A protein has these predicted regions:
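Short S/T/G/P-rich N-terminal loop/turn motif that feeds into the first structured element of a domain
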Residues: 1-73, 83-93
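Short, exposed beta-strand-loop hairpins at the edges of beta-sheets
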Residues: 77-79
Length: 93
């Protein structure tokens, strides 16, 4: 597994829609394909315009598909809510 940090900027007023999907059964099933959810840490900016997740990824291709719009489950919601995202690989020191 690889530790990855994802920072996403959300379209204005779309935080609740984003989190609704991420917590839904459909969203959780897709996220399980990517990472160990028991090791996921998340936070949100005070104005709810950005989210950050540290995830323990076991399928990087699925992660990229989930984020870039090529996953048919996440695409409709991410087209609606996502402004941009950045992915960082984390290394323990």
């Amino acid at each position: 597994m690889k530790d990855i940090l994802v920072v996403a900027k959300l379209k204005e007023g779309k935080f609740e829609t984003f989190m609704g999907f991420m917590k839904s059964e459909e969203g959780m099933n897709e996220r399980r394909k990517i990472a160990d959810l028991t090791k996921t840490l998340g936070t949100v900016s005070p104005d709810k315009s950005a989210v950050m997740f540290k995830i323990a990824v076991h399928d990087e291709d699925a992660m990229y598909s989930f984020l870039d719009g090529s996953n048919p489950v996440s695409k409709p919601i991410f087209d609606e809510v996502m402004e941009s995202y950045e992915i960082f690989e984390l290394n323990k020191i």
